[in-house]
Structure formats: structure tokens, C-alpha cells
A protein has these predicted regions:
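Gram-negative bacterial Sec-dependent N-terminal signal peptides
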Residues: 1-22
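Gram-negative and organellar
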Residues: 21-63, 71-72, 79-99, 111-477
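Membrane-embedded glycan transfer/ligation machinery
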Residues: 107
Length: 477
């Protein structure tokens, strides 16, 4: 590829930079451009019969593949024109014909293959083509810019940073240099500390989860206690990018609730975690280990050590799967006979209908085992559903959550034992959150949430209902 042509190839990048956003932000996954590449994919075509377009003396000529093959100079001009103008549809038609030509510019063909692969979402293939080009022509800034962007898209952060650093040393046009700086800033933000926090004031019914019945035969149960709680949450996490999409993470968080009038129900959990993972444009997988400590009633209650596996993948631009498995061992500092281990497996499927609506369904399995007291052993089978909606131009948004589950215990409960039955619980959880984008303060939008939780059981002591209403405030730094 002649040197003049290598710089001419910057023209489509320069044009796109003029209309680019101020910064290549880390958008919400459901609106991320790289997951929409196949939505406008051209229909299968017979490339030998579809005409190409060549501009000659201000006119656009319609020429079929056979004619182009008989005119190598015209075919080369058509190929070069499609690449320089970043005409994906034109490259898709002309490239197969161009590759049949004996006399061809191998570098131009390789560059066109890279552009087409990237447009079709085959980013790894595009990176391979661009690397081959850079190896042959290290001073091709247009190719290096596309390589850097493809590496960024595929979340190979360390390699992308290296390429953008090299581009910074080039004498690029100001608009492209600005884009390079924005990409470098976005890469730094990917690996920066992320701090998030929130709090809410809750009016809560049945804090102590007392049974629905006050009396059962000769037994009298505790009365239900209502109260106001202050819920809080604060967390921080950092990611360190390694080579080829690998990364390590570390973080910590603390969350809990305080009941000003009922301090014996105060509950707090604090934990730290660290792990390693791999991510590219479609998937994110990793393993993390964690340590958590819980206090209840302002006194130490338990601590847990465990590990968590996760695998998230975009199956299509609109469908995403989220899977995780967690194992942990809990030590109860108040009652050694309550030590246990747990296993949790969760799978979710999310459908993003558009930027304003999404649906989610999930299946959960949770198992808890206590070697010292089999009466605490149970399996829980859960089903989850969520619907998020932004209501047109009104500014109002909502999130509806529904959940149902069954708990199967290994042994009878105290009261179910009188009936000769193992304990069986049925759970129902519902919540509705509402917020309006016009209501915010310093980037924080308050969210009103109403929730209801109900447990039905063949053991009367474990039947209860719980209602909560609260306004929550969340912020990510």
C-alpha cells in the first residue's frame, strides 16, 4: 500500500471523529454499540450478480462483478474508494470480487477484510488482520487507529493502551488526536477505583418476623414489632487490566440497617473480596474469593469465607445470560451448633426490548447444610422475574420485581412434627420502584420502593408477612 494511501485512509476516521461523542464512555451494557452490529446486517446475496458502484467523472456507474473482473484498474479503484469512504456495504460486495483478481494489493485486501470483520462483530478476526498489517507496515496510522479501537472494544485494555500511546506520538490531525486522548481517558477509567453508596429510610412492618398468629393452642408467640430503619451501603472496587483480556479485582463493602428505637435488631455485614477474570466484547467470566463478617444487635454474630464463580455473556445484541455459583462456610460466633456451609447457583436471562424496556427471568438454587443440627438443613428453589420500563417522554421510570420460592427441610419443624411432616415453606416477594428523572440532587435521583414479603409454612411458627416502604438514594463515584 503506497505511503500516500496509508494517510488517505485516515479520512473516514477523521470524518467519524467530527461527529463522535465527547468521550467514549462506558455505557449501559444494553445500549453498548458493539452489541448491535448484527441488527442491520445485509441479507445473503449472490455477489456475482449484484452490481458495484464506481464514480467516474461525477457519475455513478452500475457495474456487475464480471465487468469488474475484466477491468482490473476499475476494480482496484472501486475497492480503494469503498475502503477510503468506509463504505461497509460496498466493501461487502466488492471485496469477494477483488480477492479473485490475480493482481491485487495484498495490504489493501487485508485492511478491507479487517474493516468488514470488525463491522460484523468478528473483532478477534479483525484484530488479527490489523496486527498482520502493522507488522508489514508499522507506519500506517489508520491501521493502528483501527487496531487500537478494536482492542478497546474487545476489552484487551493493556494492548489497547499501548497502541493509543504509540498513536499519541504520531502527527495526527487535531480531531483524531482528541479521539486518542478520549480513548486513553476511558481506559484509565476502566481501571480506576469505583466507589458506590446509598441509603434509605424505611418504614417497616414486622421487624422481628413474628408469626401471623399470636396464639396457637397453648403457645403464645411474640408480638409483631414495627419501626423505622435507616439502611446504608458503601462499597469500593478496583480492576487491574492484564494481557489479552485478563484482569484482577479487589474490593470491599459494608451494608446494614439501624433501627433507632429497636437497637437489638441492628444488622450489619462487611466484607472484602479479590479475584481474577477474563472479559471480551461478549463475555465476562471470573473467580473471586471473599470474607464477610456480620454483627447483629451491635454484637459479633458470624463470619463467612467462600468463593464465587461467574459467567456473563451476550448471546445476541438483545439477549444476555448471567450465571454464578457460590460456596461458603459460615462460623457462628454465638452458637457453634449453627455453623453451616452453603451452595448457591443462579441463572438469569435478560431481554432488552429497546433502550427503554427490559425483561428478566431467573432460576435459583440454594442449599444449606449444618452437620450438627440437621433440622436446619434445607434446599431452596426460587424463581425470579423483573420488568424495567421508562415511560415515554414523561420522565417516569419503574421497576417491578416478583419472586417465588420453596424451601424443603430435611427434618420436621417443631410444630410440623406434630403432624408427622417435614417442614415446607413457600415464599412470595414483590416490590415496585418508581423514580422521575426530573427529581435529582447532585446527580442522585431518589427512588420510592414498596415491597411485600410473605412466607407460608406447614410449621405455624415460621409463617409471617413483612411490608416495607422506603425512599432510597444511590450514587456511584
Amino acid at each position: 500500500m503506497p505511503a500516500r494511501n496509508r494517510w488517505m485512509l485516515l479520512l473516514p476516521l477523521l470524518a467519524s471523529a467530527a461527529y463522535a461523542e465527547e468521550t467514549p464512555r462506558e455505557p449501559d451494557l444494553r445500549s453498548r454499540p458493539e452489541f448491535r452490529l448484527h441488527e442491520a446486517e445485509a441479507k445473503p446475496i449472490d455477489r456475482e450478480k449484484v452490481p458495484g458502484q464506481v464514480r467516474e467523472k461525477g457519475k455513478v456507474l452500475q457495474i456487475d462483478g464480471e465487468t469488474l473482473l475484466k477491468n482490473p484498474e476499475l476494480l482496484s479503484r472501486a475497492m480503494y474508494s469503498a475502503v477510503v469512504s468506509n463504505n461497509i456495504a460496498g466493501i461487502r460486495v466488492i471485496l469477494p470480487i477483488y480477492l479473485q483478481q490475480a493482481q491485487q494489493d495484498k495490504m489493501l485486501a487485508l485492511y478491507a477484510q479487517g474493516i468488514l470483520a470488525q463491522a460484523d462483530g468478528r473483532v478477534k478476526e479483525a484484530i488479527s488482520h490489523y496486527r498482520e498489517l502493522i507488522a508489514a507496515q508499522p507506519d500506517a496510522p489508520a491501521v493502528r487507529m483501527r487496531l487500537a479501537a478494536a482492542l478497546f472494544e474487545n476489552r484487551q485494555n493493556e494492548a489497547a493502551a499501548d497502541q493509543f500511546d504509540r498513536l499519541k506520538a504520531e502527527n495526527l490531525p487535531p480531531q483524531l488526536m482528541e479521539q486518542v486522548e478520549l480513548y486513553r481517558k476511558a481506559l484509565r477509567e476502566r481501571d480506576a477505583w469505583k466507589v458506590n453508596g446509598g441509603f434509605s429510610v424505611t418504614r417497616e412492618h414486622n421487624i422481628n418476623q413474628a408469626p401471623k398468629r399470636q396464639q396457637y393452642g397453648k403457645w403464645t408467640f411474640p408480638k409483631q414489632v414495627d419501626g423505622t430503619a435507616v439502611n446504608y451501603r458503601l462499597g469500593a472496587e478496583k480492576k487491574w487490566s492484564l494481557k489479552n483480556g485478563w484482569y484482577t479485582t479487589a474490593g470491599g463493602d459494608v451494608s446494614g440497617r439501624v433501627y433507632p428505637g429497636n437497637k437489638k435488631f441492628n444488622d450489619m455485614t462487611a466484607g472484602v473480596s479479590g479475584g481474577i477474570g477474563f472479559a471480551d466484547r461478549r463475555k465476562d467470566a471470573g473467580l473471586a474469593v471473599f470474607h464477610e463478617r456480620r454483627t447483629y444487635g451491635n454484637d459479633a454474630y458470624s463470619y463467612t469465607n467462600g468463593a464465587r464463580l461467574y459467567f456473563n455473556r451476550w448471546q445476541t445484541p438483545k439477549w444476555q445470560t448471567l450465571s454464578s455459583a457460590e460456596w461458603g462456610r459460615l462460623k457462628n460466633t454465638r452458637r457453634a451448633r449453627s455453623d453451616n456451609t452453603h451452595l448457591q447457583i443462579s441463572n438469569s436471562l435478560v431481554f432488552y426490548r429497546n433502550a427503554r424496556q427490559y425483561w428478566m427471568g431467573g432460576l435459583d438454587f440454594y442449599r444449606e447444610r449444618n452437620p450438627a443440627d440437621r433440622g436446619d438443613n434445607f434446599n431452596r428453589y426460587g424463581l425470579r422475574f423483573a420488568w424495567g420500563q421508562e415511560w415515554g417522554g414523561s420522565g417516569l421510570s419503574s421497576l417491578l420485581r416478583l419472586g417465588a420460592a420453596k424451601r424443603h427441610y430435611e427434618k420436621p419443624g417443631f410444630f410440623s412434627g406434630f403432624k408427622g411432616e417435614r417442614r415446607r415453606d413457600k415464599e412470595l416477594n414483590t416490590s415496585l420502584s418508581l423514580w422521575h428523572r426530573a427529581l435529582y440532587f447532585k446527580g442522585i435521583t431518589p427512588r420510592l420502593t414498596l415491597s411485600h414479603r410473605e412466607t407460608r409454612s406447614n410449621d405455624v411458627f415460621n409463617e409471617y408477612e413483612k411490608n416495607r416502604a422506603f425512599v432510597e438514594f444511590n450514587k456511584t463515584f
